[in-house]
Amino acid sequence: IRDSCYPMWYNGHGIDIGRLHRGYWLPVKPGWYYGCGEYGAEGLDSAEVMEERYPREWLREPFDPGRIVRSQTKSFSGFFYDAQEDMQGWISRSQRYQAFATRMMTEAFRRDDRMVSNAIHLFIDAWPSGWMKSIMDCKRIPKQAYFAYRDALAPLLVSLRTDRFAYTAGETIQIEAFLCNDTAKSGAYTLAFELYNEQNKLIQTGRVPAHADACRAAYIASAEFPAETAQDRETLTLRAVLLDGNGDVVNDTEQKLTVFQDVTVVPNDDVVILKLEPGLHTVAGETVTVKPCGMLPLHFVSRKTAHPAVAEFKEQDFSYWYNAKEDCITPLLDTTFTVEGFTPILLSNNMDEQGNWGPVLAAAEKLYEGKHYVICQLELRQENPVAKRFLRNLYRLGTK
């Protein structure tokens, strides 16, 4: 069975990325093997290609990727990352996202023992602004995704997998390790784990035996360690190194995680937090229009609003949240809204009445008759430390 699958560009296409990352695939008969005929995400051409080959009109200031013929970055980037300020910012951010999506999907396919074939679309572009999901442009300049793809296709690959990219201090972190062997040789190896703190200091190690069966992918072990930090938030890096019988490195990889100190959420009667159903509503004297996300529920919202409730957060904090009930990553937003008179807190992307994609609201607030009215369409699952901190910050809006 062959099929295309673009959940990290045509959001949710084929299968939600949380389920793909967890190990699921499209419906297939029991015992059948399968392949993925196409997948990928868009990354803009290099500045060199743009400046040499693009019409000047496409590049005039202020730079707008929507002027690039056949590019979908302007329309769809709001599903995945913040809007950028200039040409170099758009190139860098789009290519960085493309690399992230390429690694996430390719490694999911490598871990799937029944996935026998897959093809990124495309490897090399034929034209300027041709097919920007290509991982190398028409001048043979590799995008960041080229290197992510190369690394994910190592014949003998160590792949780390987690459904949680953020933890609260005191929890136990569990990261699964898989050994993906595309060679015809079996062998015995050792898998070494190394945990580093934000200052790149080695703080914990561990080793387990790892056997690679020929032409197979298999779970090996989970690295378990306490989520500890003396800071308010800290990025930890787990490195996994595959060693042969001589102690030489065969393959290695790493996964970054963020550990947050716990916070206390104190409800405030002066703050009214609402999550609205699709339709028309009147809130704080304003008409609110709520509609479903136009390209399936989303895994990202932008905090690029300068609102004090999101000042402490980083770009990707509001993305790929864990769902304890489902035990996997699930979307955090299934509806957006538009309203006048409210101050934006979180932004998303949706289609307007003319069929154009553009910015809309995921959360916004208004002070009205002595109370702060907050419309928040996110699923604020409290097992996610960012969701808990955000809820705390919303209630603090009413603190005099």
Go through the PLM ranges and name each one.
Residues 14-192, 203, 343, 348:
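Substrate-binding clefts and catalytic carboxylate motifs of secreted carbohydrate-active enzymes
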Residues 170-211, 218-224, 232-245:
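Beta-strand-rich binding/interaction modules
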Residues 288-386:
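Catalytic beta-strand/loop cores that center a nucleophilic Ser/Cys/Thr
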